[in-house]
């Protein structure tokens, strides 16, 4: 790490989390970033990559535009971490001397049409990793944020961007760039403003996936007070109407590689062996569900999510999140307790209609995540009844 930092300094780069808003940022960016908070320095940083096919060039002024947008998102994450009591922490960014984000430009081996939405990520990631292997001083974490210009053809253009990968895959995520992808349109009641909310909201949302976040919703009372969670439908509200991050999301981020504080030497995501579950209890107490787990001592965070069907990928936006209260038992095990008032599930449509699920996300001290799904039928559980959790079956990742 010291060698990488020394190389970065020689290249005129800095790992500072935030400083004064760069003077060359446009007035709208200056305005939106005027209330920036001082973020804690991080040990690791997001690899930001601008990837173009061999028949395309980057879009005009992409470095300034993407920098303004990314720093705004970094601030949003940091302010939400602080609001949730986890400190002024956000994902680290490597900055150039002029304050722009260090965006790594990679030119693909094939034409831009090869890197299309459905499967284009495969060769893109192969080429990205090959490039970073040749330039290890540029790889500052395992998290890659890949941005591609929209396809310009008979279907896609600046008024209807698309055609490129736009999703999260493990520690990688993809977003797009287009001519009007500019923070000056944020919150504007114009076509460009509405378009920016969609694609900039998606930019922030897919980045969340690349930083280990699953879809999740807030409770009924939280949503009434704060708006829409970013990892629910916040990609359609970001910058336009109140959008927030749940405590469950922020607790996952607190144990993610690019949020690790300066000086941290943890090797992240190395443990793929599920932690032991020593005890589990799931019961209904009147109008509340209660979950208690005793787990291996390396567990540092547990979230409980209640979801109605369907349970397939991208059908979990409405999974209501309940972060567990964490404790340490006399035997040195990790205790986790979730209190789930049924009234807070009011936005779920099928709570009492057949099988729903309790999803448990378990996070270890080096950031690895494991999921355990417990299907149950609430309508068949008496007011003070116990729900069978079955044999613990933990799956790595999410």
Regions picked out by a protein language model, each given a short descriptive name:
Residues 158-185:
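A structural motif
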Residues 1-4:
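Positively charged n-region of N-terminal signal peptides that target proteins for export
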Residues 21-144, 148-165, 312, 321-333, ...:
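Propeptide-to-catalytic entry region of secreted or membrane-anchored zinc metalloproteases
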Residues 388-398:
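Compositionally biased low-complexity segments at domain edges in trafficked proteins
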Residues 197-215:
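Active-site recognition of the HExxH zinc-binding catalytic motif
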Residues 180-203:
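Short pre-active-site segment immediately N-terminal to the catalytic Zn-binding motif
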Residues 6-15:
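Bacterial N-terminal signal peptides
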